[in-house]
Every structure is written in C-alpha cells, then in structure tokens.
C-alpha cells in the first residue's frame, strides 16, 4: 500500500519526528491513503476507438463501427458491434468526433438503447470540417451506447492519417 503524508494546518494531528541532514525535525502530519480498494479498481471503465477507413454513403440509421480500438478498460466496447455495453451501473461520459471533407457533410447521433442522447454535424460547402459532441448519461449495466448515421442526411465520414474520427467513453462514477 502506498502512503502519502501531508503537512497538517492544525497540529491536532499526530506529531511525527524525522531526521534530515543530521537535524531532528518534528512536524504535525496526517496520513492520506492513495490506494483504491479492490471494488474501486474493478470499476475502471474507459474506451477509445477510431475509424480505420472512410465511411462512404452510410445508409439510413446505419450504425458507425469504430473498429480501431485504442483503449478498452473494463471490456465494455465491442468493436464488432461498434457499441459500448455498460458493465456496471454508473454515470458515464461519451464523446464522438467526426470529420468531413469540403462539399460533403454528415450528421451522427449518439444513441443509448435506441434513444438519441447527442448529435453532431460536420460539413461545409467548401472546406473540410470537424466537429464533436460530448455528453453525460446515467447507464444501467447492460445498456448500450453507439453512434448512428442520422436518417439519409450526409454522405461521407472522411479519414486520413491526420484526421481521427473517434468514439470515446468513460465511467465517471459507479452507482
């Protein structure tokens, strides 16, 4: 177990004596544990996934599958489905970033169990454009969150080595 000692502002705490360079010092210190309990460490849930290739002419309500998984703590993100399934009840943060090239646009929904919880639009008549959406949602274990193309609006999600379209999420607080 790691320990961390902090100088106390009030000297009601235990007095601690230590020696530095052959001089004896007495200070008022208190102990703050820095180690999570086993139940807290089991609640580390986070993921980050990118698109490995462009999505051209996605269909109506097509799920966007972020197949290049960079991080998957807790195993909640399923690349073959393109969705995150909550392993535990909690408050989660989700973010989706999308880019489109000039004269193209795309509208994506962030969806929880078939209900939209966020929306992002990227596109311009001339310039490349990127946009993102971040939201917080309370999930019950087994709830699914994914990114879906909106209806028939938009036609291209652009990908190259400088543009990372991503879907990320993290557990903020277990409940």
Predicted regions and their residues:
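Extracellular jelly-roll beta-sandwich "head" domains, especially the C-terminal globular C1q domain
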Residues: 1-175
């Amino acid at each position: 177990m790691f320990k961390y000692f902090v100088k106390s502002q009030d000297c009601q705490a235990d007095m601690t004596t230590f020696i530095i360079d052959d001089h004896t010092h007495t200070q008022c210190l208190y102990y703050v544990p820095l180690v999570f309990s086993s139940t807290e460490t089991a609640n580390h849930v986070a993921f980050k996934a990118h698109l490995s290739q462009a999505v051209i002419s996605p269909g109506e309500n097509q799920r966007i599958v972020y197949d290049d998984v960079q991080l998957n703590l807790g195993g909640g993100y399923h690349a073959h489905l393109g969705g995150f399934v909550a392993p535990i009840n909690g408050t989660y943060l989700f973010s989706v970033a999308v880019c489109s090239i000039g004269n193209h646009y795309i509208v994506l929904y962030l969806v929880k169990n078939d209900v939209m919880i966020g929306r992002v639009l990227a596109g311009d008549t001339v310039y490349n454009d990127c946009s993102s959406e971040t939201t917080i949602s309370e999930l019950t274990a087994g709830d699914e969150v994914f990114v879906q193309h909106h209806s028939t609006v938009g036609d291209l999600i652009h990908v190259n080595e400088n543009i990372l379209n991503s879907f990320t999420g993290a557990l903020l607080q277990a409940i």
